UniProtKB/Swiss-Prot annotation:
Its main location: host cell. Belongs to the influenza viruses polymerase PB1 family. Keywords: Eukaryotic host gene expression shutoff by virus, Eukaryotic host transcription shutoff by virus, Host cytoplasm, Host gene expression shutoff by virus, Host nucleus, Host-virus interaction, Inhibition of host RNA polymerase II by virus, Nucleotide-binding, Nucleotidyltransferase, Phosphoprotein, RNA-directed RNA polymerase, Transferase, Viral RNA replication, Viral transcription. GO terms for cellular component: host cell cytoplasm; host cell nucleus. Residues 249-256 are annotated as: Promoter-binding site. This is RNA-directed RNA polymerase catalytic subunit. The keyword Transport does not apply. The gene is PB1.
Length: 757
C-alpha cells in the first residue's frame, strides 16, 4: 500500500511536524574492545575539575584522595567541583522552609521501607561487579556469591532475609582482618581422544580458596567496575559507566529511596515519574509561570545543559545533605544513610580489561592488563595514551584508580535532583528580594529554567544569579550548550514543549518492527507497540493502520510465513502451502503459519491466538496449544511478559505484552560453548538459584505470598506450607488418607536431613 507523503501534512500544526526531522535511522553505535581508555579519561577529567582541592592519603587502603569541598570560589566560566558546604546546606534548608515537613515525612516513609525490604531487592538489575571473582556477573549471581562468602566467614546476620541485616554484615566485613573467598579457575591439559586418537585440550574447572587481607578486601568492596556505554547516538566519543559491587548497592538503594520520596513531593522534579504523568507535572510549572507573568512582565525559558554533572558532584556534599535532611531522626537511620556517600568518597574505579597490542609483522597479539599499567614502559603507547597513563599513575593501586571526587554515571540520580531543585526553589521573589524571579524543572542533570522579569535587563540579571548560585554547589551550567527562548518553546528530557508538550512520535520509531524473540512474542510485541503509540504518542488511525500493514509485511519476511495462497517462494512455502490446503477454516491459521492477518486498529489488544481461536480447525487447535509437543521447550508463560524496546533516545524501556503459550513460543537453546569455560560453575550456581526460586513460588502463589517476616529459611517455610495445605486438602476430601500420610512423611524426612546437615 503506497501513501502519498504530502497527504500526511494536511491540517497538521507546525509543531507536530517535529517527527519528520528524525535523524536516527539504522543501528546505534556499539563499543568494541576495552573501556580502559574511557575510564582513564573520566578519572583524569574528574581530578582536573577539582585540582585545587586538598590531597590526603586514605589510612586503610593507602589511596591518595583529592577533596575539593570548600575549595576556591571560581574566577572564570570553566567547570569546577568546588561546592561550598554552607551554601548547599542553606539551599536545602530553604527547600524545607518552602515545603514544611517534607524531610520529616520522607524519613518516616524510608524507615518503613528499610524495615520491610528483603535481600532479594538486590537481585534486580543487570551486570554487577562481583568482588569475589573480580569481574561482572548478573546481579542475582553476584548477590548469591557475596552471601555465600559472608556466611563462610562467619557473617550470618543476612540469614534473616532482610536487606538491613545484610548491610550489617557488610559493615562487619570491613572490620575483619581477613576474608576467605572461593575463586573459579580453569585447568587445561592435553589428552589423547580415545575415538579419534588426536590430541585435544581438556578443560576442567577448579575452585580454590584465597585469603584477602583487610586492605585488599576494602579495595574490592569500594570498587566500581567500569564498562563502555553502548548505543549512544549523536556522540563521536564513547564514555565509561560504572557498576558498583554488592557492598555499595544496598546502601545506595536506601539513600535513593529517601531521595525518591522527597522528589515525589517536589513539583519541579522530573523524577521519579515518567511518560504522561511527567508531562502533566511539568506543564503545571510552565502554566504557573505563564499565568503569573502579568502583561507587564517578560518570561523566558532556558533549555539547559550542565557540563559534566557527575564529575563535578561530590559525595561529601551528599553526605552533608543527608546529615541535614535526617537531623532529627534516630541514630541508626542516620548511620545507615550516611554510609553510601562515605563509601563513594573512598571509591576506586576499576580500569577494565587493559590494552590489546598486536604486532602486524609477527602476527602476535597480547593483552596488557590494567594491573600492569602502573609500571610498564610507556614507549609502547601512542602520545595520547601515554599522557593519560602518566596522569593516572599516582592514583593506581592493584589495577584500580583512586577516585574520591565525582559520582560516576547514574548513581545518585534522585539525590542530585533534590540538590538541583533546591537551587530552583531559591528563585522565589521572597528569596531573590528583587524584581526578577525564577522557577523550573530538574531531572537528574537535565534542567529547564523559566525566568520572569519586568524587562530584558532583569531577565539577564536573573540568569546570571542562577548561574552563580549553581556554581556554589558544584553545578556548572554550560553557557555554550544552553539556549534561551520566549517561554512557550523549550525542550526538557527529550520532551518538546510548544504551548503544551508535542508528541514526538519519531522517538519511538526504532521500537517498531520485529523483535526477533520468537514468532509468538514478536507478533504480540509488534501490535502492542502500535497500540501504545496510539494511546500515548498521537499516532493517528490512518498512520496506525499503515504501521500495522508494514509490520505484518516485515513479520512475514522475517519468519518466511507468507500467506498459503501466495506466489512467493521461500524455504517454508512448501510446508505452509500444504497446511493451507488441508485447513478447512483458513482464517483460523496464525500469520506465522501462513494465515491471513485479522488485526486492525480496533482489536490490537487481543492476542492473536484468542482472536482466531473460534475460527480454528479442531485438530489445528490441538497441535497449536499442546504442552507435550517435544519440539518446544516450554517456559511456564505467565499471562503477561516483558519485552525490552529501544526508543531513539534514553534507556531501553520495558514494555508489557500479553503472552499466550503456544508451540510458537519456542526458546532458543543456550550456546554450548559456555559449558566448557570457567563460567560453567557460575552457570550451574545460577540455575540452582533459579530452581530454588521457582520451587518457592510454587508453594507460595503470588496471591497468598506475603513476604516472610520471621527468620525461617525458605525450606522451613515451604515445609510448613506443605503441611498446612495437605491438612486442608485432606479434611475437605480432595486427597486420600494414604496421600496425606505420604506428604507428612516427606516433610519429616526433609526436616531430619536439615538437622543432620
Amino acid at each position: 500500500m503506497d501513501v502519498n507523503p504530502t497527504l500526511l501534512f494536511l491540517k497538521i500544526p507546525a509543531q507536530n511536524a517535529i517527527s519528520t526531522t528524525f535523524p536516527y535511522t539504522g543501528d546505534p553505535p556499539y563499543s568494541h574492545g576495552t573501556g580502559t581508555g574511557y575510564t582513564m579519561d573520566t578519572v583524569n577529567r574528574t581530578h582536573q575539575y577539582s585540582e585545587k582541592g586538598k590531597w590526603k592519603t586514605n589510612t586503610e587502603t593507602g589511596a591518595p584522595q583529592l577533596n575539593p569541598i570548600d575549595g576556591p570560589l571560581p574566577e572564570d566560566n570553566e567547570p569546577s567541583g568546588y561546592a561550598q558546604t554552607d551554601c548547599v546546606l542553606e539551599a536545602v534548608a530553604f527547600l524545607e522552609e518552602s515545603h514544611p515537613g517534607i524531610f520529616e515525612n520522607s524519613c518516616l516513609e524510608t524507615m518503613e521501607v528499610i524495615q520491610q525490604t528483603r535481600v532479594d531487592k538486590l537481585t534486580q538489575g543487570r551486570q554487577t561487579y562481583d568482588w569475589t571473582l573480580n569481574r561482572n556477573q548478573p546481579a542475582a549471581t553476584a548477590l548469591a556469591n557475596t552471601i555465600e562468602v559472608f556466611r563462610s566467614n562467619g557473617l550470618t546476620a543476612n540469614e534473616s532475609g532482610r536487606l538491613i541485616d545484610l548491610l550489617r554484615d557488610v559493615m562487619d566485613s570491613m572490620d575483619k582482618e581477613e576474608m576467605e573467598i572461593t575463586t573459579h579457575f580453569q585447568r587445561k591439559r592435553r589428552v589423547r581422544d580415545n575415538m579419534t586418537k588426536k590430541m585435544v585440550t581438556q578443560r576442567t574447572i577448579g575452585k580454590k580458596k584465597q585469603r584477602l587481607n583487610k586492605r585488599s578486601y576494602l579495595i574490592r568492596a569500594l570498587t566500581l567496575n567500569t564498562m563502555t556505554k553502548d548505543a549512544e547516538r549523536g556522540k563521536l566519543k564513547r564514555r565509561a559507566i560504572a557498576t558498583p559491587g554488592m557492598q555499595i548497592r544496598g546502601f545506595v538503594y536506601f539513600v535513593e529511596t529517601l531521595a525518591r520520596s522527597i522528589c515525589e513531593k517536589l513539583e519541579q522534579s522530573g523524577l521519579p515519574v515518567g511518560g504522561n504523568e511527567k508531562k502533566a507535572k511539568l506543564a503545571n510549572v510552565v502554566r504557573k509561570m505563564m499565568t503569573n507573568s502579568q502583561d507587564t512582565e517578560l518570561s523566558f525559558t532556558i533549555t539547559g545543559d550542565n557540563t559534566k554533572w557527575n564529575e563535578n558532584q561530590n559525595p561529601r556534599m551528599f553526605l552533608a545533605m543527608i546529615t541535614y535532611i535526617t537531623r532529627n531522626q534516630p541514630e541508626w537511620f542516620r548511620n545507615v544513610l550516611s554510609i553510601a556517600p562515605i563509601m563513594f568518597s573512598n571509591k576506586m574505579a576499576r580500569l577494565g580489561k587493559g590494552y590489546m597490542f598486536e604486532s602486524k609483522s609477527m602476527k602476535l597479539r597480547t593483552q596488557i592488563p590494567a594491573e600492569m599499567l602502573a609500571n610498564i614502559d610507556l614507549k609502547y603507547f601512542n602520545e595520547s595514551t601515554r599522557k593519560k597513563i602518566e596522569k593516572i599513575r599516582p592514583l593506581l593501586i592493584d589495577g584500580t584508580a583512586s577516585l574520591s571526587p565525582g559520582m560516576m554515571m547514574g548513581m545518585f540520580n534522585m539525590l542530585s535532583t533534590v540538590l538541583g531543585v533546591s537551587i530552583l526553589n531559591l528563585g522565589q521573589k521572597r528569596y531573590t528580594k528583587t524584581t526578577y524571579w525564577w522557577d523550573g524543572l530538574q531531572s537528574s542533570d537535565d534542567f529547564a529554567l523559566i525566568v520572569n522579569a519586568p524587562n530584558h535587563e532583569g531577565i539577564q540579571a536573573g540568569v546570571d544569579r542562577f548561574y552563580r548560585t549553581c556554581k556554589l554547589v558544584g553545578i556548572n551550567m554550560s553557557k555554550k550548550k544552553s539556549y534561551i527562548n520566549r517561554t512557550g518553546t523549550f525542550e526538557f528530557t527529550s520532551f518538546f514543549y510548544r504551548y503544551g508538550f508535542v508528541a514526538n512520535f519519531s522517538m519511538e520509531l526504532p521500537s517498531f518492527g520485529v523483535s526477533g524473540i520468537n514468532e509468538s512474542a514478536d507478533m504480540s510485541i509488534g501490535v502492542t507497540v502500535i497500540k501504545n503509540n496510539m494511546i500515548n504518542n498521537d499516532l493517528g488511525p490512518a498512520t496506525a493502520q499503515m504501521a500495522l500493514q508494514l509490520f505484518i509485511k516485515d513479520y512475514r519476511y522475517t519468519y518466511r510465513c507468507h500467506r498459503g495462497d501466495t506466489q512467493i517462494q521461500t524455504r517454508r512455502s512448501f510446508e505452509l502451502k500444504k497446511l493451507w490446503e488441508q485447513t478447512r477454516s483458513k482464517a483460523g491459521l496464525l500469520v506465522s503459519d501462513g494465515g491471513p492477518n485479522l488485526y486492525n486498529i480496533r482489536n490490537l489488544h487481543i492476542p492473536e491466538v484468542c482472536l482466531k481461536w473460534e475460527l480454528m480447525d479442531e485438530d489445528y487447535q490441538g497441535r497449536l496449544c499442546n504442552p507435550l509437543n517435544p519440539f518446544v521447550s516450554h517456559k511456564e508463560i505467565e499471562s503477561v511478559n516483558n519485552a525490552v524496546v529501544m526508543p531513539a533516545h534514553g534507556p531501553a524501556k520495558s514494555m508489557e505484552y500479553d503472552a499466550v503459550a503456544t508451540t510458537h513460543s519456542w526458546i532458543p537453546k543456550r550456546n554450548r560453548s559456555i559449558l566448557n569455560t570457567n563460567q560453567r560453575g557460575i552457570l550451574e550456581d545460577e540455575q540452582m538459584y533459579q530452581k530454588c526460586c521457582n520451587l518457592f513460588e510454587k508453594f507460595f502463589p503470588s496471591s497468598s505470598y506475603r513476604r516472610p517476616v520471621g527468620i525461617s529459611s525458605m525450606v522451613e517455610a515451604m515445609v510448613s506450607r506443605a503441611r498446612i495445605d495437605a491438612r486442608i486438602d485432606f479434611e475437605s476430601g480432595r486427597i486420600k488418607k494414604e496421600e496425606f500420610a505420604e506428604i507428612m512423611k516427606i516433610c519429616s524426612t526433609i526436616e531430619e536431613l536439615r538437622r543432620q546437615k
